[in-house]
Amino acid sequence: MTSPLAKGLEGTGNWVDDRIGGARYIRKSLNKVFPDHWSFMLGEICLYSFIILLLSGTYLTLFYDPSTREVIYNGSYVPLRGVSMSQAYESTLRISFDVRGGLIMRQIHHWAALLFMASIVVHLARVFFTGAFRKPRELNWLLGVGLLVLGLVEGFAGYSLPDDLLSGTGLRISYGIALSVPVVGTWAAFLIFGGEFPGANIIDRLYPIHILLVPGIILALITGHLALVWYQKHTQFAGPGRTEGNVVGSRIYPAYAAKAGGFFFLVFAVMAAMGGLAQINPIWLYGPYNPSQVSAGSQPDWYIGFLDGSTRLMPNWEIHALGHTLSFNVLFPTVLLPGILFTLLALYPFLEARFTGDRSFHNLLDRPRNVPFRTGLGAMAIAFYVILIIAGGNDIIASVFHVSINTITYTLRAGIFLIPPLVFWITKRVCLSLQHSDEELLHHGVESGTIRRLPSGEFVEETVALPVPYRILMTGVERDDQPALAGADGHTGPGYGEQYEVTGSSTKPRGFFREKRSNGSTAAPRPESTLPELEGSVD
């Protein structure tokens, strides 16, 4: 028997559907299929951490006062009572010690910000190494790079709002960076800070940027990113039943929705646990910002640390000409270098397509070992970044290990030029070696544990054909009619050798720039095609 409430909801739904006709679209959308591979959860962590940031940030906004007006602190934290400080710092202390749940909310917000940036970086790395940025998903790659840059801006703005000694030091550095820009730097610094540092308006201006402008743009980019994923369908790894024209996985309802909902609450629980148990950014220990004080061993959040490291490694180069000074030792590591790196990162899909001649649509992902040049580039970039992060803590390393800071700096200066190319070469050779291993398995099969005696009296181990899922993963195609290799001496197993040819594409493991390990041959690029209509399927 139908309840009155159910009848009322059904009637309301029918009334709405008669006017906007959304039932058919919703029914179709609920049947959409998403892949089940764990790596696709990395992007979801980014989304969930952003939701946590919005929720916790809204709570903090209710109690934070973005004012640089001087006040005398008389709150709960006894060591700072009677100290003159800005209203922004005083309100942050009040959130930490006097507002119920304020400190845990602050720490959840900070940990979620770190997780947000980490998930973006790891998600971009997954997309890069698997080739998920290739046609037709170049625009989504650009949106991801845009999210990364905006995340850096948003994190720095939020980190600067408490107006403590550590965040004030970061603002002082940013003021110097602005001054290093030729011609417009002085005017830009005065415009942003409202005069000579520390200025009177910087906190007032960072606040709307942090809570309104940048989050709004990030929300728009995330919405556009999800819309493109929904329209273009998900990429997937090669496997049984998976082709360029379908998606194998779980329907969005109920399986995927239940899994995604549980995963969100898991991320939220981890953030809550870290906010309650792991202290981060204890501003009461730093004290209010004072331009005459500098804290030793200060470190920014990890995603900004590479800029600190690049600045510390840069020699003290300045150019004096026509009565002006060009501070190249600040301009290059903090403005030019990140600009070049992020530009190359954004343009990479187009550069790869240009050099490889690949203009085809791709919905199946690459195995990193099968594109050794791209994988080597990614490993080289990671090595470059890690060296800069280490350089950002050269003073702490020198203090802990009792090593000369000059020795560390000069060593890292040499390493920044030598280590990344070495990592590239090693990674490329490892990828080619893994290709060789795959070809051996395809050719000879896998060991069976059975020993057979040949007519000549020799004992050999029998091999069996590689299981179909692994063969598909290595070759990218699914075929059951490939002949086993025959051998008169009995040494060849029932593998698939070099005979797996498919019309229209090369199924041999091949590298970037048409690279082939075994015989130096080149594989022709796939012919130009149109984007296939992707029909979802469930395994």
Label the model's feature ranges.
Residues 313-330:
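Membrane-interface amphipathic/re-entrant loop segments adjacent to transmembrane helices
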Residues 1-313, 332-539:
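Membrane-embedded alpha-helical bundles that constitute the cytochrome b-like, heme-associated redox core
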